[in-house]
């Protein structure tokens, strides 16, 4: 199956979509097909993982599971391609080519490339909508180059793989906050994505029981400009969604501010004792956009 002609892929000069999945993306091991539908139902998009979530000896079985559910029903029914992402193994590994061969026989055209490190690597995924996962030192340093690839629709960063690639032991300090290098990498990926007009996806929160910590990190992701956040457990989805859905008070305040701006008819004006200009109005517009999407 030609990726450019398959379901979910556009054709012509502008064949690559704008990434709109989210805000809660849920990983699901590809070798657990009985979980596919549940993961899809509980999230905004499911990530079928052929990489880290699958043991080397089970990768062949995982690819077979993806193919086997096509056209089937029940708990292993075929997933909606517009809400499905497949994470493939890194370019240059034996499993990468096998993953592509599998994908060519499916309708799934949004791919997450594990350990993306250069823009050149993205040529191997021409015709696919790619989320480039920057999770090595090289990938972070080259994030801006990677984001410029035409088929890249978004960047995500991976904290634990990044630290491991540098010989470290943990991305977080004892208080739960990120170490400086992780914070720098998170910001680097966010800026690279937004500068290229692509979406940015925040890394997973690995402390599954700590929903309060996840809520705080998700709120920061929203405020910073990340368009989505990845999850590793269904219980995390509601927390991420709540963070991205503005409160009724925030929506009302944003509407009032934009109405006041329209009435003022000037570039800069005072509103409730504060000076308001273009960037502040964009914040209000972003709040209303998130309200419509939630």
Where are the regions a protein language model picked out?
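N-terminal amphipathic/basic-hydrophobic helices that include classical n-h-c signal peptides
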Residues: 1-16
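Expand to "…catalyze enediolate/carbanion chemistry for C-C bond making/breaking, isomerization
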Residues: 13-294
């Amino acid at each position: 199956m030609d990726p450019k002609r398959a379901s979910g892929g556009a054709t012509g000069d502008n064949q690559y979509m704008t990434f709109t999945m989210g805000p809660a993306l849920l990983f699901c091991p590809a070798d657990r097909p009985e979980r596919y539908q549940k993961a899809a139902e509980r999230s905004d998009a499911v990530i079928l993982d052929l990489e880290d979530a699958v043991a080397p000896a089970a990768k062949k079985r995982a690819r077979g599971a993806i193919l086997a559910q096509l056209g089937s029903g029940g708990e292993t029914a075929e997933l909606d391609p517009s809400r499905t992402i497949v994470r493939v193994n890194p370019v240059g590994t034996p499993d990468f080519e096998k993953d592509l061969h599998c994908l060519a026989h499916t309708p799934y055209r949004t791919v997450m490339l594990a350990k993306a490190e250069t823009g050149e690597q993205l040529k191997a995924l021409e015709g696919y909508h790619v989320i480039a996962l920057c999770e090595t030192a090289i990938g972070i340093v080259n994030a801006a180059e990677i984001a410029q690839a035409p088929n890249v629709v978004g960047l995500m960063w991976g904290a634990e793989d990044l630290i491991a690639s540098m010989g470290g032991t943990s991305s977080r300090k004892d208080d739960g906050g990120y170490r400086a290098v992780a914070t720098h990498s998170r910001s680097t990926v966010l800026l690279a994505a937004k500068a290229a007009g692509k979406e940015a996806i925040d890394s997973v929160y690995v402390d599954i029981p700590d929903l309060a910590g996840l809520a705080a990190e998700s709120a920061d992701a929203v405020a910073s400009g990340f368009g989505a956040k990845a999850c590793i457990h269904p219980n995390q989805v509601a927390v991420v969604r709540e963070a991205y859905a503005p409160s009724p008070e925030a929506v009302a305040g944003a509407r009032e501010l934009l109405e006041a701006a329209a009435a003022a008819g000037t570039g800069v004006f005072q509103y409730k004792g504060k000076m308001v200009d273009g960037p502040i109005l964009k914040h209000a517009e972003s709040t209303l956009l998130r309200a419509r999407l939630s």
